[in-house]
Amino acid sequence: MSYKLSSNFKPYIEGLIEQKQVVGYPYDTSSMILKDFDRFCSKHHPTATVLTAEISMQWAARRTDEHVNYQFRRITPIRQLAKYMNSIGVDAYVIPPKIPQKQIRYVPHIFTKPELHAFFNEIDKRLPSPFSPARHLVVPVFFRLVYCCGLRPSEARLLHTGDIDMATGRMFIRQSKGHKDRTVMLAEDVLALCRKYETKVSRIFPDRQAFFPNSKGEFYNRSIPDYWFHLFWDHLEVAGIYSGNSPRVHDFRHAFSVRRLNLWVNEGRDINAYLPYLSMYLGHVHLTDTDYYIHFASEFFPTFKRKSTLACADLIPEANHAKK
């Protein structure tokens, strides 16, 4: 944490972060929020030594134009801080669990075939850069791996060179969401792509650790995939033709999941039997997280809706059209 904590809650914030990291949680995002909370306390409650309801609820109050989902993410670490303080014998007010209201589930953009074709065609035109010698090789493979394997962008970004077995196609995903490792098997065409990529990049960075190296041969920072996406997507003709939320890098993962479900239905597969496999492949902790995609598949693919209505009528969740 480069920011120097300055409020009277500094020792407790440091203690909570240390506790989380000791048991294996990166806790990076929450640490940033706790840093902001420390600034908030230093500015508005510089003499406070007790985490009171007044301080906590002032922090928890919804800000102008703030989405309820971000409000939820902003409150959670402070609730954890109060619980940590109570656990070591220091009185602190715990923000009630019903604050804020239930999060609104994000409706992803499901890429169409023309959109995918246009995007991948565009990134394939990437030219070598004198400032980053491997970037023109990294970008096309990075996005194909995210889409073809349904990876979270961070999972692809943080791949190590040894995480993909070029002989078997076994890919190891380390410490992903929920801090769980998992193994993903690559399709033959994706594996062939990775082999060609590895051969070329290893000539540039023979001793690198990052599978997708930046200009120094190290891991890219978390903001780069979004930057790349908008760099290539925003000027495409198809970019302005969509309904709902604007596309994001993470939506390639959603598109993979929805298309996989539709493919299984077209093949006459039993979705009830296959859904747990998709859940494990995606690294979901709960099967309900995977059920989420069934609704989008039924909306996006008429064939899916027609064939699966009777087969999994009890499995398709009702749409929750809660408004922001």
PLM regions: where:
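Conserved catalytic core of the tyrosine transesterase superfamily
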Residues: 1-324
